[in-house]
């Protein structure tokens, strides 16, 4: 991929052979962002485990990720009032199921009560493809719809590694204070280490980097980050 002059000039600010502590990495990564909009600060970390399909869960970022999350809730009766009061943008039962079945997916997260899952499950080809299918392990199949909506709105994100074993997550915006970004990142590390499979051997997090949406990736001293976060 061809890189522009702006990127090449910014890349010279970062020593690609060096591993930085997390405070330095966040400061450097933010300084290389060259978007006209408020870009996202992202982390990438490679997990050391053979059964990648077992690595997944949710992380509640203390300062959110700066993203407005439009939540849809499939539920009935009084639960609909609870979901609306919590701030869900779209609330309904069979009416919403029919709308989504028609191809509408103009929302970012989806919650369902257990009694709705028989019908919601039929939307698998649509919701599954976009990563929107409610799941008990992710806390999005629940009777406490208000709690689920609040957590999604306040920055709870779902994680899973890609085929190469790398977990990618947005942890805030370039406009965030450095301290808030660092705290969000430390929360990611704490959660990943807490969720580490019991039979994982050696260093669980092999590499770690921080980068803006458009900018330069900065390598982090992963051992120091883990040791100072847990």
Curated annotation (Swiss-Prot):
One of its GO terms (molecular function) is structural constituent of ribosome. InterPro entries: Ribosom_uL1_bac-type, Ribosomal_uL1, Ribosomal_uL1-like, Ribosomal_uL1/biogenesis, Ribosomal_uL1_3-a/b-sand, Ribosomal_uL1_CS. Pfam families: Ribosomal_L1. It comes from the Bacteria. CDD domains: Ribosomal_L1. Gene3D superfamilies: 3.30.190.20, 3.40.50.790. One of its GO terms (cellular component) is large ribosomal subunit. This is Large ribosomal subunit protein uL1. The lineage of its organism: Bacteria, Pseudomonadati, Spirochaetota, Spirochaetia, Leptospirales.
């Amino acid at each position: 991929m061809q890189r522009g002059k702006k990127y090449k000039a910014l890349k010279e600010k970062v020593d690609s052979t060096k591993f930085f502590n997390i405070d330095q990495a966040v400061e450097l990564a933010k300084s290389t962002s060259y978007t006209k909009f408020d870009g996202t600060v992202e982390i990438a970390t490679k997990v050391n485990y053979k059964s990648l399909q077992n690595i997944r869960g949710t992380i509640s970022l203390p300062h959110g990720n700066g993203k407005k999350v439009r939540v849809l809730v499939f539920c009935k009766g009084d639960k609909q009032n609870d979901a609306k009061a919590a701030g869900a943008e779209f609330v309904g039962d069979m009416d919403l199921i029919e709308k989504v079945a028609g191809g509408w997916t103009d929302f970012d997260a989806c919650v369902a009560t257990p009694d709705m899952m028989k019908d919601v499950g039929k939307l698998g080809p649509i919701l599954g493809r976009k990563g929107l299918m409610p799941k008990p392990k992710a806390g999005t199949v629940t009777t406490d719809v208000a709690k689920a909506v609040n957590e999604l709105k306040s920055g709870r994100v779902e994680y899973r590694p890609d085929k190469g074993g790398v977990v990618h997550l947005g942890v805030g915006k370039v406009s965030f204070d450095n301290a808030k970004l660092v705290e969000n990142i430390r929360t990611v590390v704490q959660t990943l280490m807490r969720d580490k499979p019991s039979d994982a051997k050696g260093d669980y997090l092999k590499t770690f980097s921080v980068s803006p949406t458009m900018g330069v990736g900065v390598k982090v001293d992963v051992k120091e980050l883990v040791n100072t976060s847990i």
